[in-house]
Amino acid sequence: MAQATISITVNGEAKEVEATTTGVELFAEDKNIIAVKINGENRDLYTPLADGDTVEPITLDSEDGLAIMRHSATHVMAQAVQEVYPNAKLGVGPVIKDGFYYDFQVDKPFTPEDLKDIEKRIQRIIKSSQSFRRRSVTEEEALKEEADQPFKIELIEDKEAHLDPAAATEISEKELSFYDNVDRDGNVVWKDLCRGPHLPNTRYIKAFKIERSAAAYWRGSEKNPTMQRIYGTAWATKDDLKAYQTRLEEAAKRDHRKLGAEMDLFSFPDEIGPGLAVFHPKGAAVINAMEDYSREMHRKHHYSFVQTPHITKGGLYETSGHLHWYKDGMYPAMHLDEEYDADGNVTKPGFDYYLKPMNCPMHNLIFKSRQRSYRELPLRLFEFGTVYRYEKSGEVHGLTRVRGLTQDDSHIYCTREQMKDELTSLLTFVLNLLKDFGLSDFYLELSTKDPDKYVGSDEIWEEATRTLREVAEASHLDLVADPGGAAFYGPKISVQARDAIGRTWQVSTIQLDFNLPERFQLEYIAKDGTHQRPVMIHRALFGSIERFFAVLLEHYAGAFPAWLAPVQVLGVPVADEFAPHLAGFVKSLEDEMVRCEIDYSDDRFGKKIRNASKSKVPFILIVGEEDMNNNAVSFRFRDGSQLNGVPVDKAREQILAVIAKRVQVNSADDFNAAVAE
């Protein structure tokens, strides 16, 4: 009797295969294939194929393959933890960038020795070649199997758990399933609630490393129990793992928190609170240079500068929608202005005031403060506006995630006819300014509507999204989709920049908004005399001053280009008798607004040079007897190269030229090339 067959499409080609075929048989000859994409959905190799299926292989070294392998690694890690702590309660184990984590409720935090023991057990499990086998279950069956796992029970009973990105690794909207870890004898040695997919077996986990552990709240809420989270990473090859660890080592050297302390740039005093940075004189010098250049460029592009208060009545954020959509990210209300009589009775009701989380509502009030004409549009309002956002204490991170931040915030009001041209010129302005700060490798991300969290009509959102996409595509930069990633009031383009070691940072955002003008009843008088709504564009070029400062600090590893450097010139006299000559030259630079210091310490000259090199100053100026006699100075650069005996007038001219050109100079060759242009 002939074997029944089915028709499938594999990599675009039609094939007839036996009806019982799975991905295991289909791709048996290629051991690098670890899963399949069936009709666009990632599935295990063991998944039976059906007539009409479209099948694509997933290789271990692909993006999908790495994600599947890392998720399988979380199961192995959880199995190892429960070998050590049989009573550990399991949370969730999602894949994150370059790795994964798993949350556990245990009696005490994991120690470094615990993690070493767990990692050894992981290696034994991997070598045992356990297979991952999926089985579907009913809710009743799942609850019975997880009777001693309260966090899993919560996920099973939560009908919207699949909407939680971390929980979605466990729970599917369609059905519940478990994955069994099966040993070579066919025995189930461990299991976990999971939607999958997974590797065929543990031997495909080629390069694995536990990285660290930390406390975390269950499902990210401070109201929930504290879990112990173990982070790990896994890669397709040991060489890939080694390269990743090298990148981590380089990133650690560039960590802005470390450099900020070493270079005396900023701090986070406990007396002030988490996420609230204090910039020291040298850090503030960099901030001022960033802001001054930004102001200069905004003036050239016809922006109007405004200034708004840090606190406002809550009604403003009711109008804007922030209190409905964003209240959890705002500081609590302060009830003020209430008046009482002698008996304590309220004679005048007060108001709830809020620290502002965003500047846009106040800018809308400026637009609305008088009648506007089409002749005034586009109106570009700009402010370095400080805002306050309540980030959980466990989520603040250096300058990249803070509670108080200053945005280079602009809101542009234009007609619909002006919208596309304005967005095009705005994106060009943004990219050019970022290049002036030394970032040049970009791609764009288009964030579109979250169907569960938006205001305004679908038609308006579609128009806004289409226009942003056209502008982004016209830039000829790579465009990546971010479905559902937009704020509640409009779609946005974000500029993603790669730094000196290849990491990606979100910097600028450009957000189109048809909704806030409606909520604030903003109008202008059109050419035909009718009242029309303006289009509103939100734009933050740096994102925030604090975050962009951190990005630049890590990008340059503290060695800022001269125009941004906290100290641009450091003078080091060979001996005390040469200090007056050096001081006179430094004074002439300070008169030109160059940021200078002189080392007058009692240290030996060699130590002064070592200290100067550690400070990452772009220009170390040395004066000895020959320099003094010839009215000259000598340059020492970051790489140790020197230019000796440069006449002071020429040296001053060259230093000012390099600063004005905003170029990076780390060596004598760089310097000569810069001044020769």
Curated annotation (Swiss-Prot):
Listed SUPFAM superfamilies: Class II aaRS ABD-related (SSF52954), Class II aaRS and biotin synthetases (SSF55681), ThrRS/AlaRS common domain (SSF55186)
One Pfam family, short name: HGTP_anticodon
GO function term, MF aspect, one: tRNA binding
Swiss-Prot/TrEMBL cofactor(s): Zn(2+)
Cysteines joined through disulfide linkages: none
SMART domains: tRNA_SAD
Boundaries of every TGS domain copy: 1-59
Region described as Catalytic: spans on this chain: 255-561
Record's subcellular location: Cytoplasm
Single biological process term from Gene Ontology: threonyl-tRNA aminoacylation
InterPro entries, A to Z: aa-tRNA-synt_IIb, aa-tRNA-synth_II, aa-tRNA-synth_II/BPL/LPL, Anticodon-bd, Anticodon-bd_dom_sf, TGS, Thr-tRNA-ligase_IIa, Thr/Ala-tRNA-synth_IIc_edit
Residues that coordinate or bind Zn(2+): 360, 411, 538
Enzymatic reactions: tRNA(Thr) + L-threonine + ATP = L-threonyl-tRNA(Thr) + AMP + diphosphate + H(+)
Keyword Signal: no
Top-rank taxon, per record: Bacteria
E.C. no: 6.1.1.3
Alphabetical UniProt keywords: Aminoacyl-tRNA synthetase, ATP-binding, Cytoplasm, Ligase, Metal-binding, Nucleotide-binding, Protein biosynthesis, RNA-binding, tRNA-binding, Zinc
Subunit structure: Homodimer.
NCBIfam families to which the protein is assigned, alphabetical: thrS
Function: Catalyzes the attachment of threonine to tRNA(Thr) in a two-step reaction: L-threonine is first activated by ATP to form Thr-AMP and then transferred to the acceptor end of tRNA(Thr). Also edits incorrectly charged L-seryl-tRNA(Thr).
PANTHER family per the UniProt record, alphabetical: THREONINE--TRNA LIGASE, CHLOROPLASTIC_MITOCHONDRIAL 2, THREONINE-TRNA LIGASE
Protein name stated in the entry: Threonine--tRNA ligase
Gene that specifies this protein: thrS
